[in-house]
Amino acid sequence: MLLVLAIKTLVLGLCMLPISAAALGVGILFAGYNIAVSRNPDEAETIFNGTLMGFALVETFVFMSFFFGVIVYFI
């Protein structure tokens, strides 16, 4: 029983790794937004809409990974 709990804890820890990758991805995404707006300020609204869609996609994968880890840990 202790081995199963240890494996579940490791799986939960491994499912937290995409959170750090998502933080890096969001930073790169908004850095690209800043560069794009500085080069073409007239298209700032269009670029921002695409940036928000990318942000939502990244966060979706983070939440899926987190909930998968929680489900594995508690079931």
From Swiss-Prot:
Pfam families cross-referenced by the UniProt entry: ATP-synt_C
Subcellular location: Mitochondrion membrane
PROSITE patterns hit by this protein: ATPASE_C (PS00605)
Membrane-spanning intervals of the chain: 10-30, 55-75
Major localisation: mitochondrion
Keywords per UniProt: CF(0), Hydrogen ion transport, Ion transport, Lipid-binding, Membrane, Mitochondrion, Transmembrane, Transmembrane helix, Transport
Keyword Mitochondrion applies: yes
Residues the record marks as site: Reversibly protonated during proton transport: 59
MF terms (GO), sorted A to Z: lipid binding; proton transmembrane transporter activity
Cited InterPro entries: ATP_synth_F0_csu_DDCD_BS, ATP_synth_F0_csu_sf, ATPase_proteolipid_c-like_dom, F/V-ATP_Csub_sf
Cellular component terms (Gene Ontology): mitochondrial membrane; proton-transporting ATP synthase complex; proton-transporting two-sector ATPase complex, proton-transporting domain
Annotated membrane topology: Multi-pass membrane protein
Function: Mitochondrial membrane ATP synthase (F(1)F(0) ATP synthase or Complex V) produces ATP from ADP in the presence of a proton gradient across the membrane which is generated by electron transport complexes of the respiratory chain. F-type ATPases consist of two structural domains, F(1) - containing the extramembraneous catalytic core and F(0) - containing the membrane proton channel, linked together by a central stalk and a peripheral stalk. During catalysis, ATP synthesis in the catalytic domain of F(1) is coupled via a rotary mechanism of the central stalk subunits to proton translocation.
Subunit organization: F-type ATPases have 2 components, CF(1) - the catalytic core - and CF(0) - the membrane proton channel. CF(1) has five subunits: alpha(3), beta(3), gamma(1), delta(1), epsilon(1). CF(0) has three main subunits: a, b and c.
Family: Belongs to the ATPase C chain family.
Protein's name in the database: ATP synthase subunit 9, mitochondrial
Organism of provenance: Paramecium tetraurelia
